[in-house]
């Protein structure tokens, strides 16, 4: 009996000693983990003030929505490992929200009213907070009503860490320009929505894709036009809407001579982070200075490939690298709608 007791005590002491060592090891590892997380998770905060504004893009003053006084919305930039803290201040007379297109994040931060959150009502402030766990070019926009169509869209860029194993020298360290493509119509977005719902051919007539009733009568095609409309065979086009203006970073034309104060010279390479924030237009992209090198698509790195032109669909993003060929000359980067 004493023998058994001695053995039992010896085992207990040994197990207790192992337990203390394991506990100490776990506490040490936990402390290291917490310290690393604290270093890695830098909080990057943006305050976004959403407010009505008046613009004149196409000859008439029209209502639009500006964020921090600008269209498109400010470009939001982060580095993988950061924590994004985006505070939206709603100064509109209607509710609003923000959706992060293509981002991996907690569902409650996704920005869809009545699904992942309640609408942000007039006068309210709402904070989106989520970890940045990916890299690449993406964009963000309102997910309330038709606010995106009148200005609530912007670039969302997530950079790689310098020690990232996928970091590509000569690509990921180049000077960058975010480019947001969009369209503008002087029609209220609610009217555009109604005309599309009613299958109106007014936009097709404006673009010359179909004949008006007067033209159909004059050319002897009135019967055919009526027959097609009776069959609901409306004139088709690549884009359903006629737009008064195409915008690049909120302007029809931009003259760029430097990036972050540094003048561009022959041989310099520039990375263009391009997002199509348009409502319905595909854009053909061309560069007068030579070929473009595609290096990423929808936020994902791709094997670099040279192209003469590139088409970008609604909501897509592309990263392309262009080279400045000569000094003292302007080289046009042009976006043309496919239904031109």
Please annotate each region the language model reported:
Residues 27-35:
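Bacterial N-terminal signal peptides
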Residues 36-40:
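Sec/Tat signal peptide C-region and signal peptidase I cleavage site
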Residues 1-22:
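N-terminal secretory signal peptides that target proteins for export/translocation
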Residues 275, 319-331:
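A conserved active-site cap/scaffold subdomain adjacent to cofactor or substrate pockets
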Residues 41-314, 321:
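Histidine-centered copper-binding motifs that mark active-site loops
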Residues 145-151, 328-340:
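Terminal connector regions
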């Amino acid at each position: 009996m004493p023998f058994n007791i001695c053995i039992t005590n010896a085992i207990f002491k040994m197990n207790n000693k192992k337990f203390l060592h394991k506990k100490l090891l776990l506490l040490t590892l936990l402390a290291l983990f917490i310290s690393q997380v604290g270093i890695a998770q830098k909080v990057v905060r943006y305050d976004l003030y959403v407010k009505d504004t008046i613009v004149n893009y196409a000859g008439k003053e029209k209502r639009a929505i500006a964020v921090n006084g600008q269209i498109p919305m400010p470009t939001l930039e982060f580095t993988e490992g950061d924590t994004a803290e985006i505070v939206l201040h709603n100064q509109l007379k209607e509710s609003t929200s923000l959706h992060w297109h293509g981002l991996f994040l907690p569902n409650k931060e996704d920005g869809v009213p009545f699904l992942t959150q309640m609408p942000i009502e007039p006068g309210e402030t709402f904070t989106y907070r989520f970890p940045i766990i990916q890299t690449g070019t993406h964009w963000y926009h309102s997910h309330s009503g038709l606010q995106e169509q009148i200005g609530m869209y912007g670039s969302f860029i997530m950079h790689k860490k310098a020690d990232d194993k996928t970091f590509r020298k000569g690509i990921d360290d180049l000077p960058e320009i975010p480019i947001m493509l969009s369209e503008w119509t002087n029609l209220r977005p609610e009217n555009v929505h109604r005309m599309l719902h009613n299958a109106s051919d007014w936009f097709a007539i404006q673009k010359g894709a179909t004949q008006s009733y007067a033209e159909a009568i004059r050319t002897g095609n009135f019967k055919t036009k009526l027959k097609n409309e009776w069959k609901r065979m409306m004139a088709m086009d690549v884009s359903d809407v006629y737009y008064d203006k195409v915008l690049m970073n909120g302007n029809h034309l931009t003259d760029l001579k430097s990036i972050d104060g540094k003048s561009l010279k022959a041989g310099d390479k520039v990375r263009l982070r391009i997002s199509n924030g348009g409502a319905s237009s595909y854009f053909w992209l061309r560069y007068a200075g030579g070929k473009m090198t595609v290096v990423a698509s929808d936020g994902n790195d791709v094997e670099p490939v040279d192209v003469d032109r590139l088409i970008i669909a609604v909501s897509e993003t592309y990263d392309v690298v262009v080279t400045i060929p000569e000094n003292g000359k302007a080289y046009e980067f042009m976006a043309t709608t496919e239904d031109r």
